Swiss-Prot record:
One of its GO terms (cellular component) is cytosol. The gene is rbfA. It comes from the Bacteria. Transmembrane segments: none annotated. This is Ribosome-binding factor A. The lineage of its organism: Bacteria, Pseudomonadati, Acidobacteriota, Terriglobia, Terriglobales. Pfam families: RBFA. Gene3D superfamilies: 3.30.300.20. The keyword Cytoplasm applies. One of its GO terms (biological process) is maturation of SSU-rRNA. Keywords: Cytoplasm, Ribosome biogenesis. The keyword Cytoplasm applies. PANTHER family: RIBOSOME-BINDING FACTOR A, CHLOROPLASTIC-RELATED. It is found in: Cytoplasm. Belongs to the RbfA family.
Length: 123
């Protein structure tokens, strides 16, 4: 039962961190490398010392690379702000990663369309 409570706590904390990082990214960072970005999910490690922040970046591959570089440069500021806003003594180390689900989802849709075309043409 204790583990379920800890897991629930990590999930709630991850959601709160996701919301705060989203607010910070909306207007507080002046880094021109950071493009149009959405925080998809924050996954807190079981020990609570680190968190993977999945971000979706609008645009081309190079824009995603530039945005991740900008986020890496601003990680200290973002971590400090998250800790202050949520009243955390120590915020987890933030590791920004590109969320690939949209790209994979688009690829799956494309493959399904091909399969459906083949089914229709074989009839």
């Amino acid at each position: 039962m204790e583990q379920r409570a800890l897991k629930h706590h990590r999930e709630r904390l991850g959601e709160a961190i996701r919301e705060e990082i989203g607010a910070i990214l909306e207007g507080e960072l002046g880094d021109p490398r950071i493009g149009l970005v959405t925080v998809s999910e924050v996954m807190i490690a079981s020990n609570g010392k680190s968190a993977i922040v999945l971000v979706a970046v609008a645009g081309e591959e190079q824009e995603a690379v530039d945005t991740l570089e900008g986020l890496a440069a601003a990680t200290g500021y973002i971590r400090h702000e998250v800790a202050a806003r949520l009243g955390l003594r120590v915020a987890p180390e933030l590791l920004f990663r590109l969320d690939q689900t949209e790209r994979y989802g688009g690829r799956v849709e494309e493959l399904l369309k091909r399969v459906n075309k083949r089914k229709k043409s074989s009839r």
